[in-house]
């Protein structure tokens, strides 16, 4: 509730309920009313990326969940203002955008597939959190940073948050089909879109 108020999104209630049915599927319904901060023609979805676009992220990746269950995933600040500023700064050069909740390996694949392409990530470019290698950066999840595709280089910072180009979108191939995420480390390239957080499997 407090987080919602901080972003002018109060939890109104009225449709919050539980039921005692135990032998059927769990059903969760979330109703959201919102007014876009940008004109309707500039709503940025995840399906606008095209081969040749740069892939970039805000902040640092990996290490969001600590061994005791605590960590950055419990007190992150949504990148709402950064997303709006990014759209205003890049204009039509901002092609697609989403948040990173299941890890870059999973989410880059979703963004690439939505635009009928593949994603190639440069391991050496990843902005990793302290104590994390590139593998943790692409698989840990719960980063809640922005992942976006753009035609031109993005600004180096947004409201004090670093922005890093980590790769680019490419056309699918026989080796790397639509939705594949490929990470390059030195001269090596491997698919990683099978990694990351899978809901209902616990990992």
Predicted regions and their residues:
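Active-site glycine-rich loop that binds ribose-phosphate moieties when present
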Residues: 30-47, 71-89
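A generic structural signal for well-ordered alpha-helical segments
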Residues: 4, 90, 112, 158-159
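Glycine-rich anion-binding loops of enzyme active sites
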Residues: 1-65, 168
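Acidic, Ser/Thr/Pro-rich beta/coil linker or hinge segments at domain junctions
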Residues: 18-19, 158-203
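Short, conserved charged micro-motifs
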Residues: 38-43, 152-160
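Short hydrophobic/aromatic beta-strand micro-patches
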Residues: 33-35, 147-151
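Short, ordered loop/turn segments at secondary-structure junctions
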Residues: 15-17, 60-61, 100-103, 124-126, ...
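Active-site-proximal betaalpha loop/short-helix elements
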Residues: 73-142, 172-173, 182
């Amino acid at each position: 509730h407090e987080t919602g108020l901080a972003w002018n999104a109060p939890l109104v209630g009225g449709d919050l309920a539980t039921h005692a049915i135990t032998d059927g599927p769990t059903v969760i319904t979330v109703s959201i009313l919102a007014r876009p901060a940008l004109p309707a023609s500039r709503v940025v979805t995840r399906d606008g990326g095209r081969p040749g676009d740069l892939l970039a992220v805000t902040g640092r990746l990996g290490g969001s969940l600590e061994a005791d269950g605590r960590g950055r995933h419990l007190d992150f600040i949504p990148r709402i203002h950064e997303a709006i500023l990014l759209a205003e700064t890049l204009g039509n050069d901002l092609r697609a955008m989403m948040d990173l909740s299941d890890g870059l390996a999973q989410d880059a694949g979703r963004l690439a597939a939505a635009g009928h392409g593949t994603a190639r990530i440069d391991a050496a470019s990843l902005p990793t959190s302290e104590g994390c290698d590139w593998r943790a950066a692409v698989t840990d999840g719960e980063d809640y940073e922005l992942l976006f595709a753009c035609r031109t280089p993005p600004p180096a910072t947004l409201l004090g948050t670093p922005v890093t180009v980590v790769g680019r979108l490419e056309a699918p191939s026989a080796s790397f089909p639509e939705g594949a995420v490929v990470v390059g480390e030195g001269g090596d390239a491997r698919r990683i879109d099978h990694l990351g957080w899978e809901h209902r499997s616990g990992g």
